[in-house]
Regions:
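Conserved AMP-binding/adenylate-forming
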Residues: 217-304
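AMP-binding/adenylate-forming catalytic core of the ANL superfamily
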Residues: 182, 278, 282-371
């Protein structure tokens, strides 16, 4: 079986002819000590950490960085002058008036992300083909722009669909451009495949939201090929882990990211055990993070990948706090083939579901979910309708 393209990328980035697990861990320790030296010299948020460590085992003795730290002390984590910052990504928490979370990136940080994207996409994007990108395009090398750069590096053509387009506009793109591949979130992809089931997309990489197993199975059936899940976040430079042709989990970008799995108390967990993902961004130039608790729930696979890669693999990733996630409800409601999309609102009575589909008489309904009374209103989908969520699917 073909080895993960990410392994070749790691070798090229690090100037190595081959990569063993020992090589990788030696590299991680070297980069970690270089980072600790930078932090000590800078004297910022991490200035009180040790100057160096003798082994990766000692990492667990370092304190965690929390989301609250990032909100309150983020400026003290930046190691470059503002003139060298190419992009700042800001995230505010809905329903709060607290400080926004800002992540800073240098030009080199962004270039490395593009390079990783190209490596991951090379598994499914072929020279001379077209790739439909349903991700945000925000200018100044935003996410959509970075993906487009990666597609161009592969000598393919990006079709910049973005987010917020109507189904009519998206179907026109499919008809006129005839892209072979898709990059975007899972539910919008499923919706498109249900609206245009024939002569449509052939391959896809999904990211930015959870893809329930039943939905993944249907997407793969409609595509006629396996899905390539990707995991990334602002804190890790958008690019974190991607699936290989063995389809046995997502290989981590371990030359740039030191990852751990811990329990709720912060104790390290072995491979195979589910817990919270903790990351140290070893290669980040502008704003490296040390032992950042992501709030994401996953595990490392214990067994080696059949593709032969030595890079750790993540299982499916979800949020630690599942209270507002729609993944479970999506699994139930999208089991009806007529559903195109829906939106939920929390009311005094329970949960109000409003959605559209291709056959309203076949729309599903469940009266109770997680103790909530669930009420519905379904209608036929129109060309003017848009996907109900531009980001992660949550109860509003």
């Amino acid at each position: 079986m073909k080895q993960a393209a990410l392994d070749a990328w790691v070798r090229k980035q690090e100037g190595l002819s081959c990569v063993t697990r020992q090589d990788l861990e030696t590299l991680q320790l070297k980069k970690l000590n270089q980072l600790l030296k930078r932090e000590k010299e800078r004297g910022g948020f991490y200035g009180n950490l040790p100057f160096r460590l003798d082994s990766l085992e000692e990492v667990k003795e370092l304190p965690f960085t929390t989301e609250e730290d990032l909100r309150r002390e983020g400026n003290r984590m930046v190691l470059l002058s503002q003139s060298l910052i190419e992009r700042v990504r800001t995230e505010t928490t809905s329903g709060t008036t607290g400080t926004a979370k800002r992540i800073y990136y240098s030009e080199e940080d962004q270039n490395r992300t593009v390079s990783f994207f190209a490596a991951g996409l090379s598994e499914l994007v072929h020279k001379g083909e077209k790739t439909m990108i349903c991700m945000p395009f925000s200018g100044a090398r935003g996410l959509g722009e970075l993906i487009s750069e990666a597609v161009c590096q592969l000598e393919a053509t990006p079709v910049k669909a973005g987010i917020g387009s109507t189904y009519g506009e998206l179907l026109d793109i499919l008809e006129e451009e005839k892209p072979e591949t898709f990059v975007g979130m899972p539910i919008p992809l499923l919706s498109l495949l249900r609206l245009k089931p024939k002569n449509s997309l052939q391959r896809a990489l999904i990211s930015a939201d959870v893809c329930p197993k039943g939905i993944q199975k249907e997407i793969e059936m409609r595509l006629g090929s396996r899905l390539y899940p990707h995991y990334g976040s602002r804190e890790m430079g958008l690019a974190g882990a991607v699936t290989c042709p063995a389809f046995q989990g997502m290989h981590l970008r371990e030359n740039d990211i030191l990852a751990e799995i811990v329990d709720k108390a912060g104790n390290p967990l072995p491979a195979g055990c589910w817990g919270e993902l903790v990351i140290t961004t070893l290669q980040a130039e502008a704003m490296p993070l040390i032992r950042y608790r992501t709030g994401d729930y996953t595990r490392f696979y214990a067994e080696p990948c059949s593709c032969g890669s030595v890079l750790h693999r993540l299982d499916q990733v979800s949020r630690m706090e599942q209270g507002q996630s729609l993944a479970e409800l999506d699994e139930k409601l999208f089991s009806a083939s007529g559903v195109i999309d829906y939106q939920t609102t929390l009311t005094k009575k329970g949960i109000w579901v409003e959605g559209y589909g291709t056959a309203p008489l076949e729309m599903p309904g469940i009266s109770n979910w997680r103790g909530y009374l669930v009420e519905y209103r379904w209608r036929l989908v129109k060309k003017e309708d848009k996907p109900c969520y531009l980001g992660k699917r949550r109860i509003l």
